[in-house]
C-alpha cells in the first residue's frame, strides 16, 4: 500500500507540474491574442467538468426526437464520450508537453466551424445511425455548454478572484449533490470508456495525424487522472493538497480535486452556471437538429458553429 501511495504521489507531482506550466503558457497566449478571434482567447481551460458535461448530455438526449434519439440510444457510450469534446486530448501523457495535448488546447481556441464542416463528411460516409454520429452529437453538446459558460466564468474570475479550476470544481460538487451523489467519492473515471469501438468512432473527426492509438491513450490517461484525483478520505486529500502547496500552486490547482470544504465565494458562480446550464439544453437540441438539417439537405452550417469553445 505504501509503495502504491508513493507511486501515485509521483504521478500527482508530474501532472501538477505539467498543468501548472500549461496554465502559465495559456495565460500568456491569452493576453497576447486579445482580438485575434471571436472570443479574444485561445483556449486551454476545461469548464465545466466531466460530470457537468455528462449530466448536460443526458438532458439533451431526452429532448431530441426521431432517428437522432435512436442513434444516441443505440450508441450511448460513444455519445457519452463525445460530451467531453476535444478535452480528452488535453490529458494525453499529461506529465509532459506534447503535440497531442497541445492539439487539444489548440482546438479549444479556434473556431469550431472547420471541425463541423469536416464532421459533415464523416457522418455522411458513416451514416445517420452510426456510432460516429452519436459521438458527434455528444461533441455538439460539449461545444454548446463550453461556449455558453466560459464567458461568464472568465467574468467571475475577475470579480471573485477564484481560479477557473476551482469554479469548475465547486459547480461539479453542486451538481453531484443535486443528483443525490457524494461529490467526494463519486467515480468520475467510470464515465470514460476505452473500448475499441469507441476509439474507432472518435479518430476520423480529427486531423490526418490522429490515430486510434493516440485516441486510446488519451482516453486511458484521462481515466487515470480522474482516478488519481478522486480522494474520498481526508488523509488522501491532505497528501495531494500538501503537494500542491509545496509547489506553490494550491490556489490555482486545488480545483483538480473535489475538495471536502466548499468555497463560499462560489455560491454566486454556482447560481450563474446552473442558469446557463439549464438555458443551454434547448440551444444544444436546436444545434443538433440544425446540424442534421445541413447533413440531409446540404444547406450551410448555422453561423452559431463559427465560434470557439471560449
Language-model features: locations:
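N-terminal leader/auxiliary helical segments
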Residues: 14, 23, 28, 33-136, ...
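Aromatic-lined, polymer-binding surfaces characteristic
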Residues: 141
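N-terminal polybasic/positive-inside topogenic patches
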Residues: 7-8
Amino acid at each position: 500500500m505504501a509503495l502504491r501511495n508513493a507511486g501515485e504521489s509521483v504521478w500527482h507531482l508530474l501532472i501538477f507540474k505539467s498543468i501548472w506550466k500549461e496554465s502559465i503558457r495559456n495565460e500568456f497566449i491569452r493576453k497576447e491574442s486579445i482580438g485575434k478571434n471571436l472570443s479574444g482567447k485561445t483556449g486551454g481551460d476545461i469548464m465545466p467538468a466531466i460530470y457537468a458535461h455528462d449530466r448536460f448530455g443526458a438532458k439533451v438526449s431526452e429532448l431530441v426526437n426521431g432517428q437522432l434519439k435512436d442513434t444516441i440510444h443505440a450508441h450511448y457510450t460513444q455519445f457519452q464520450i463525445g460530451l467531453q469534446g476535444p478535452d480528452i486530448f488535453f490529458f494525453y501523457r499529461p506529465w509532459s508537453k506534447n503535440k497531442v495535448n497541445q492539439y487539444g488546447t489548440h482546438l479549444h481556441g479556434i473556431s469550431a466551424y472547420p471541425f463541423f464542416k469536416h464532421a459533415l463528411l464523416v457522418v455522411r460516409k458513416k451514416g445517420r445511425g452510426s456510432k460516429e454520429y452519436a459521438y458527434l452529437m455528444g461533441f455538439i453538446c460539449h461545444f454548446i455548454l463550453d461556449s455558453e459558460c466560459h464567458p461568464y466564468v472568465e467574468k467571475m474570475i475577475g470579480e471573485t478572484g477564484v481560479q477557473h479550476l476551482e469554479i469548475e470544481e465547486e459547480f461539479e460538487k453542486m451538481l453531484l449533490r443535486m443528483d443525490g451523489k457524494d461529490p467526494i467519492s463519486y467515480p468520475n473515471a467510470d464515465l470514460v470508456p476505452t473500448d475499441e469501438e469507441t476509439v474507432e468512432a472518435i479518430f476520423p473527426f480529427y486531423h490526418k495525424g490522429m490515430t486510434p492509438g493516440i485516441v486510446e491513450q488519451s482516453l486511458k490517461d484521462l481515466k487515470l487522472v480522474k482516478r488519481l484525483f478522486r480522494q474520498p478520505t481526508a488523509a488522501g486529500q491532505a497528501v495531494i493538497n500538501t503537494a500542491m502547496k509545496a509547489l506553490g500552486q494550491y490556489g490555482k490547482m486545488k480545483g483538480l480535486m473535489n475538495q471536502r470544504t466548499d468555497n463560499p465565494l462560489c455560491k454566486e458562480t454556482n447560481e450563474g452556471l446552473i442558469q446557463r446550464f439549464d438555458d443551454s439544453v434547448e440551444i444544444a437540441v436546436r444545434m443538433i437538429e440544425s446540424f442534421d438539417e445541413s447533413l440531409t439537405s446540404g444547406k450551410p452550417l448555422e453561423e452559431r458553429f463559427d465560434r470557439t469553445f471560449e
